[in-house]
């Protein structure tokens, strides 16, 4: 079925910033629609998000240039192509852009088109998006990694690490895992309230209280887990996104950037030792960006120290890019990759990164961005790739709930065939 029209438009994301939405129209009248997310802390090797830089509009964050590229460059190039040729369409987008970083058309323009094409194709075939992307062997519902305390660049809280998450690994199914997470979230609200701390939420729906550093955040979560009636380490484990690239400079991890005078300055070896200490002390089973994207030696050391104990997720390190992932596999840096579709710019390249990771024994975590929309594509991608893990925020804000609710629908649709969570053989 051929594409007859592609329309791009400027909409707003969950932070009130402009982003790109794309409609792909087919000759039969079907429309596929996708909206593009945006990150606050971004890896320096991510594909380029095209912004207008016009300070008179949206503080320079407008996306009219990207929208124009959709309507005037991509539309005429793709019209007439079969919507079922996802790989060929994505290859055409890459050729049209002609740069490694997607800086001509903008990764936001390209991704909007790529995802909308997939959604239109699924609608044309009258099958769910996860089934269209993944084929018949798609049945794994992901363990949610719920960001219930925000720090770093995602909040004003004086904590260097960006995210403290809970993982309901002891649940029997996704629905129960979601319930467990919600109950802990509400228990944490009471824990914080009883201490006179703020229960306002950050970009991803987690709380952003003025806690006394990393250990205070972890212990507050453990208290909430127990208050909700669950056993830490058995029912629910803890994951962290350190976002270390945000405070790494000249070989030093400088916690004072976010924590003020209370923060420490740690060398590479001291950073590895600190994370190892935290894993020994608390039920932590996943650490994202424990070392900076430019600290490959540090990543090697961290992997030697903790690689057989916990999941070490590369986000800024790999930026959903097979080139960086290939290096990480070869140099034994990390054992997992975070998947963010807008880091690379097309669905095909995203799936290639996931496939490479799984082929080499790495896990993958399908992820949102801090600036989100009501688009639920990543929920389908998580199931389509049997990744078994999804990171899509806390238990508040509709832009986050949209993904969880889509996963509830998918689990219901799969029925007894659904399996909950990634299990490493």
From Swiss-Prot:
The keyword Zinc does not apply. The keyword Cell cycle does not apply. Its cofactor is Mg(2+). It comes from the Bacteria. One of its GO terms (molecular function) is magnesium ion binding. It is found in: Cytoplasm; Secreted; Cell surface. It catalyses: (2R)-2-phosphoglycerate = phosphoenolpyruvate + H2O. Keywords: Cytoplasm, Glycolysis, Lyase, Magnesium, Metal-binding, Secreted. One of its GO terms (biological process) is glycolytic process. It holds the Pfam family Enolase_N. Pathway: Carbohydrate degradation; glycolysis; pyruvate from D-glyceraldehyde 3-phosphate: step 4/5. PROSITE patterns: ENOLASE. Its EC number is 4.2.1.11. (2R)-2-phosphoglycerate binds at residues 162, 340, 369-370, 391. This is Enolase. Catalyzes the reversible conversion of 2-phosphoglycerate (2-PG) into phosphoenolpyruvate (PEP). It is essential for the degradation of carbohydrates via glycolysis. Coiled coil: none annotated. It comes from Porphyromonas gingivalis (strain ATCC 33277 / DSM 20709 / CIP 103683 / JCM 12257 / NCTC 11834 / 2561). Mg(2+) binds at residues 241, 288, 315. Belongs to the enolase family. Binds a second Mg(2+) ion via substrate during catalysis. The active site is at 204 (proton donor), 340 (proton acceptor). Disulfide bonds: none annotated.
